[in-house]
Amino acid sequence: MKTICMMRDLYKALAEFEAQFEKEYDLSLNEAMILCALQEAKEEMTSTALSARTGMAASHTSKVIRAVEEKELIKRALGKTDKRQMYFSLTPKGKERLKELNLEKVEVPERLKGVISGLDKG
């Protein structure tokens, strides 16, 4: 039971962080994860690759992609060899937006600080 209670506390802390993050940056964490994945890849990615990289379900990834496209932070292009395949990349506005993300502006709940510092070590 202790593990479930700890997971509940982590979930609540993450929800609190996400609300603060979205208020500060006008981006959901999922939208930010799409931008981060594209930045780390340093090349165009398919929605399938973005889904795998972020851990989101394919249907949810499509919704998030549409949201960041509407904000003009990413763009889509047809595949060069397979015109049915779509590839996504950061726009200049998206790259600039990533530079603006300063997490010091958003208070990370204590419960998450330990988890985050543990991930940095791995």
Residue ranges and their predicted role:
Residues 17-57:
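N-terminal helix-turn-helix DNA-binding core of bacterial DNA-binding proteins
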